[in-house]
Amino acid sequence: MNYPPPLSGFQKPAGQAVPQMVGTPQAVTQQLHQHPPGLMGNQGNQHQPAQLNNVLPMMMNQVQNVITGGAGGPQQAVGPPNVGTPNAAQAALVAQQLSNANNPLCHPHLADPSLLNSPIWKLQLQLAAVSRQSLGQSNVYARQNAMKKFLNNQNQLGLSTNGQDGVQSQQQQGQQQQPSQSGQQQGQQPLGNDASMSLVEHTKQHLMEMASSGNEATASAVNVNSDLNSTGFSTPNTPKAELHPNTPSLLLQHKKLSQYNIDEDDEIEHRMVAPTNSKHDDQLWHALDLSNLALFNLNEKLFHYEFLTRLYLNGNSLTSLPSSIKKLRNLRVLDLSHNRLTELPKELGMCYQLKYLYFFDNMITTIPWEFGNLFNLQFLGLEGNPLDKQLVKIIAEKSVTGLIFYLRDNAPEIPYAKDRKFIEISADGEPTNEYESLQENTNHMNNTLLKNSFTLLSYNTLCHHYATPKMYRFTPSWALSWDYRREKLKEQLLDFDTDVICLQEVETLTYEEYWVPLMEKYNYSCLFHAKTRAKTMHAKDSKKVDGCAIFYKKDQFQLVFQDSIDFSSAWRSHKKFHRTEDYLNRAMNKDNVALIAELKHLNTNENVWVVTTHLHWDPQFNDVKTFQVGVMLDYLETLIKQHHHVNNNNDIKKIPMVICGDFNSQLDSAVVELFNSGHVTANHKDIDQRDFGYMSQKNFSHNLSLRSSYGAIGELPFTNMTPSFTDVIDYIWYSSQSLRVRGLLGKIDEEYASKFIGFPNDKFPSDHIPLVTRFEISRGNATQTSSRKV
């Protein structure tokens, strides 16, 4: 929905004209440079960050005049032209700030002058002073933005005039600039430049100055960051460990590195040039300025504007911020300064895209632990609050980044009270009972079904080479460490105790040195295949490449046949291979693989094909994922025909098969359509206008009868959870004519999941969650077996 733009401007009595920013740039500049009404009158209009002690006497006098009517009586106009007298609420806000002006609890540098030696605390004071200058000016951000656009238009007009009129135009422009130049000679600021600068722009400017200063620690952090990102820097003194992971870039080629230090303006710019399907919507405005409007409460409808990237609530009389602020997950800038807030809602920590958060001059004493999620934050404006001394010390010494990491790493544990249920499925495909665990379900099953069934788990374990502090800045450092995550993975796999385990993103060295000894100890046989690029690397580096693994219980299965598919090379050797531009430019250089095992189920003597894969990650290459699945299914059909000596399509459909893994494909993708329907619609958005030769000509079709095992209860709410993406991309597909689903591992407790912006965390060691299915082998077993003991 394209919401109408909000009304902006001054609040006024009925029948009174709205003050206008009219006239020349000089007039607009003068209006923007006026001091807040009731603070300083009309003197001293230079826009300079004044020291609080210097302006206190004048501010006190002006506030007294506002409250009492002053020497001129109640009708005396106070403040700049065209701006009305501040109302009682605004005057009370000013009075509150003045009463705290010499309070060392609100201004800790008064009690601890050593804070003034910290460039980070100096920046707090500078920007707090800039923020206070806007107090009382309704919609000040909108005014500044209008001024900026006006000046840009004037500059463009001037350039255009220069090009058309030549020397005559230059002479005229020189005459027009004479007043401005003479003003500069008298020591004034260049016209309009400072007037159009918002608090956010001042913040960026000061951060850039700090980054380019001679401070060795700051320069070091910036240099490290500039090696990794072309978009500037994050915050001063960002720990090197967070920005410089020791992972070869080649190993990261299939993972998207998050750019956490893009300015909010750049973010909008990038969205405008992004492909249509990646844009937020057709919304034309993304900022809302409600500054200095004497607001006491916020309407809940405000938080339906989930498209907002900037929200300005400074200079009001707000005493609380509703928890529904968490809905505004696109926010980059939030200004809450100069209100009466006593606390910040913990739900604000869900707005992980915040880059600039200001709450100068409130009554806030602490910062919620949930702010450890705000890993994109570049500046946190907190001066003027009676904050806990420890928090002040951390931010003064380690900057906002250090504070966020402190909150992240020391947050209290969130209990995981409700584990995932195991859902029993009847032979008719209907959910019947829920059990606390897979083991409890097994204990309640009859022997016949136990004999005819097996359990399978699929899990992307998040290879530790991809789990870098830069990629997962929201995860506590101790919970992201490989030692911790590996132990958690071990606990999960052994607790589920499934008959078959299929893992993706398993490092070769970890497979050989950790998983093989561990799984053999628990009576599993082990299979593995690394991604294609391992073949092109030195032996030492190739051990760091990840791949797919299959583990199966020796007392349940016997290996009949093992194979693997390197999608690109498998297609090149296909008898109908034909070079196309899309194959050469888009698919050929992808190194994704699939691991295949034909296993004999010892209790039934039926052979079951188990396949696990991990498709390419990039959503801009959905056509390549479709191609990879097409190649895999075509290859599997050929193997089945060879091993089972069948050519009839109906016979092929009856061969027991499970295909599972991380398909990086959502429910509306061509990949899912291909599995479900056996082909892809020719004009599907994922493959439209793409040409992969024979694969495209036959619409990637296959003759296998496959369904998603979770179709019995509906796909889970998500299988992959990160701050920027939460959805279903992992699946377990099975041959519906020879296997029946008899049980499924359910969803993660929604209340628990809602408290996080992404995984991994202390309970879930990967950004994916495991899927578990119990299959009954139904081929040759026409009798429907009840699941319960009698």
Curated annotation (Swiss-Prot):
Its EC number is 3.1.13.4. This is CCR4-Not complex 3'-5'-exoribonuclease subunit Ccr4. It catalyses: Exonucleolytic cleavage of poly(A) to 5'-AMP. Mg(2+) binds at E505. GO terms for molecular function: metal ion binding; poly(A)-specific ribonuclease activity; RNA binding. LRR repeats lie at residues 251-272, 283-305, 307-328, 330-351, 353-374, 376-398. PROSITE patterns: LRR. It holds the Pfam family LRR_8. SUPFAM superfamilies: DNase I-like, L domain-like. It comes from Kluyveromyces lactis (strain ATCC 8585 / CBS 2359 / DSM 70799 / NBRC 1267 / NRRL Y-1140 / WM37) (Yeast). Its cofactor is Mg(2+). InterPro entries: CCR4/nocturin_mRNA_transcr (IPR050410), Endo/exonu/phosph_ase_sf (IPR036691), Endo/exonuclease/phosphatase (IPR005135), Leu-rich_rpt (IPR001611), Leu-rich_rpt_typical-subtyp (IPR003591), LRR_dom_sf (IPR032675). It comes from the Eukaryota. Keywords: Cytoplasm, Exonuclease, Hydrolase, Leucine-rich repeat, Magnesium, Metal-binding, Nuclease, Nucleus, Repeat, RNA-binding, Transcription, Transcription regulation. One of its GO terms (cellular component) is cytoplasm. Residues 168-190 have a biased composition (Low complexity). Belongs to the CCR4/nocturin family. Residues 156-193 are annotated as: Disordered. It is an enzyme of class 3 (hydrolase). Acts as a catalytic component of the CCR4-NOT core complex, which in the nucleus seems to be a general transcription factor, and in the cytoplasm the major mRNA deadenylase involved in mRNA turnover. Ccr4 has 3'-5' RNase activity with a strong preference for polyadenylated substrates and also low exonuclease activity towards single-stranded DNA. It is found in: Cytoplasm; Nucleus. Residues 156-167 have a biased composition (Polar residues).
